[in-house]
Amino acid sequence: IVTGTLGKALGGAMGGYTTAKKEVIELLRQRSRPYLFSNSLAPAIVGASLKVFELLKKDTKLRDQLEWNTNYFKKGMLEAGFDIIDGDSAIVPVMLYDAQLSQTMADALLEKGIYVIGFFFPVVPKDKARIRVQLSAAHTKEHLDKAISAFIEVGHDLNIIKTAK
């Protein structure tokens, strides 16, 4: 059984999928609470999702740009002294380990024009609070540099990082 989401990969839309043998899918359709107590996707969302798959088959330019943006941002944040959880996702967790600090940092970054979300328990395990940065292929190098600079400035102000200004 393989499941996945279409939410982030397809531009923040909705929906997901499950693949398995026909018998398993039939059982899930009869017994799966999320399936039974949810609604079908709007036709416009289904159409947009199908179009994205069509575009991805033709060209990897957007995916390649997203990968470059993600790697560039992570490198800049690590060099600045932030604790980043490694992974292949364009959602980059900047670990702060303190719930209040994650909220304070998110608020300070918003004042600098950088919109991020502070996550803490019960969304993530206790003492694993973080800032969630969601990158996009639409971000330019200038956007990423602005975000990294804002993180560094706020990181110094909140004594999160100790590197030279």
Where are these regions (language model features)?
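Structural motif
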Residues: 1, 17, 114-116
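Conserved core segment of the aminotransferase class I/II
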Residues: 3, 7, 11-60
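Short hydrophobic/aromatic beta-strand micro-patches
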Residues: 19, 93-95, 134-136
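Short beta-strand/turn micro-motifs at beta-sheet edges
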Residues: 36-41, 81, 118-123
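Conserved PLP-dependent catalytic core of the aminotransferase class-I/II
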Residues: 43, 50-115
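PLP-dependent enzyme catalytic core of the Aspartate aminotransferase-like
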Residues: 111-114, 123-165
